[in-house]
Amino acid sequence: MDFLLGNPFSSPVGQRIEKATDGSLQSEDWALNMEICDIINETEEGPKDALRAVKKRIVGNKNFHEVMLALTVLETCVKNCGHRFHVLVASQDFVESVLVRTILPKNNPPTIVHDKVLNLIQSWADAFRSSPDLTGVVTIYEDLRRKGLEFPMTDLDMLSPIHTPQRTVFNSETQSGQDSVGTDSSQQEDSGQHAAPLPAPPILSGDTPIAPTPEQIGKLRSELEMVSGNVRVMSEMLTELVPTQAEPADLELLQELNRTCRAMQQRVLELIPQIANEQLTEELLIVNDNLNNVFLRHERFERFRTGQTTKAPSEAEPAADLIDMGPDPAATGNLSSQLAGMNLGSSSVRAGLQSLEASGRLEDEFDMFALTRGSSLADQRKEVKYEAPQATDGLAGALDARQQSTGAIPVTQACLMEDIEQWLSTDVGNDAEEPKGVTSEEFDKFLEERAKAADRLPNLSSPSAEGPPGPPSGPAPRKKTQEKDDDMLFAL
């Protein structure tokens, strides 16, 4: 039959296929391949002539480089041509006599040719499975699988390229049916019957991957670049902004970016299972990971910001304490009441708190007492006149003047000794009874008695050089002590 039809390469499309599959070519001539597709779509005999030329180049050819170029031309035509060409290519006769015959063991094809043929059969079987008039390749595919032939799984993403051209094929097929109306009305009915089941493949597009065209790939990558730009801007804003100090305009922009990226992620998640291009799928997964990371950062940002704002009203009362880092004078006084409110009713805790409070007050009182004591001693040293004991007249006159100015009552030496003994016994008793601490009143009394003892003791040894102790030596220390007591009471 082929002999009667003449040389397959003599037709316009055959000549171009011969050039496109020449073994001298280093790689595919895509411009020539697309020209072949245009001739097939535009001429009436284009599909048949092209298929005859491809069959001539593949069958029995030992130059497997030319065979690979012919398979590439065939694949390109299936992706870009219409239903008329698909009917011829998917026929059981062409698949079995051309493709399956090429990979027979007796021909000893290289692995690259073997895998290429199996990929074409598998992709066409999956693409044309829903079309009743294109099931010849499906039958061959199922027979090969039942015989145990393993199809390569790494190139399964090549299954989908046929779906995208089929969406445009419907219009071309409808147009071809309209062109044939004038020739035969029965052909119009047949074309209408064939056009009815053709919309079935788009229904399967949601279940099977889609191979985008180069224009769609470029548009998708530009949109992915836009998504990546939004992610970068949002990430930089989250890095620069402080949650508690962010401006309302910045927060509004951040929320807008978040909403935009959320919408973009939904589209990315829809495209991931639908795209058959492995490289595009990888890019979509990377973009999705970046979106998830920036969403996590935004959630932490919002959680910290809203957490600070919700805690602000409850912390409004101690705001002054947070600002004033100095010591709180009321902290010691309120410590016992705070611990009492916490039901810490231990006696040791209360005793410790009382000692802390008493020690604070005693320290202040002791400082005041030391100041008044120093000033009173200095004044007394300036006013007292020291004279020899022989000058009884001068001493008696000084004592009389001292008594008149202060109104003090002189006491005897025996009374002084009794007071000292009483103070010592009281001190020992208090130490034995109250080991936990002393109060402010006891400490004042202690200081007063010690002051009295310090003033009295030096005067006991002063008259030993001149005779027995007499009344003149006692009243002077007593008067000084009385004045110091008055000064201390005035200071307190």
Curated annotation (Swiss-Prot):
Keywords attached to this entry: Acetylation, Cytoplasm, Disease variant, Endosome, Isopeptide bond, Membrane, Phosphoprotein, Protein transport, Transport, Ubl conjugation
Biased composition (Pro residues): 466-475
Pfam name, any one: VHS
Phosphoserine PTM sites in chain numbering: 11, 160, 176, 180, 355, 376, 461-462
Post-translational modification comment from the UniProt entry: Monoubiquitinated.
UniProt xrefs under SMART domains: VHS (SM00288)
Signal peptide from the UniProt entry: none
Keyword Protein transport: yes
Disulfide bonds: none
Domain GAT per the UniProt entry, residue ranges: 215-303
Compositionally skewed regions (Polar residues) per UniProt: 171-190
Region (Clathrin box): 321-326
GO MF annotation list: clathrin binding; clathrin heavy chain binding; myosin VI binding; phosphatidylinositol-5-phosphate binding; polyubiquitin modification-dependent protein binding; ubiquitin binding
InterPro entries tied to this protein: ENTH_VHS (IPR008942), GAT_dom (IPR004152), GAT_sf (IPR038425), TOM1 (IPR014645), VHS_dom (IPR002014)
Motif window: KRKK: 48-56
Effect on the protein of changing residue 267 to A: Reduced interaction with TOLLIP
Quaternary structure and partners: Found in a complex with TOLLIP; interacts (via GAT domain) with TOLLIP (via N-terminus); the interactions leads to TOM1-recruitment to endosomes and inhibition of TOLLIP binding to PtdIns(3)P. Interacts (via GAT domain and the C-terminal part of the VHS domain) with UBC/ubiquitin. Interacts (via clathrin box and C-terminus) with clathrin heavy chain. Interacts with MYO6. Interacts with TAX1BP1; CALCOCO2/NDP52 and OPTN; the interaction is indirect and is mediated by MYO6, which acts as a bridge between TOM1 and the three autophagy receptors.
Protein name from the UniProt record: Target of Myb1 membrane trafficking protein
Protein species of origin: Homo sapiens
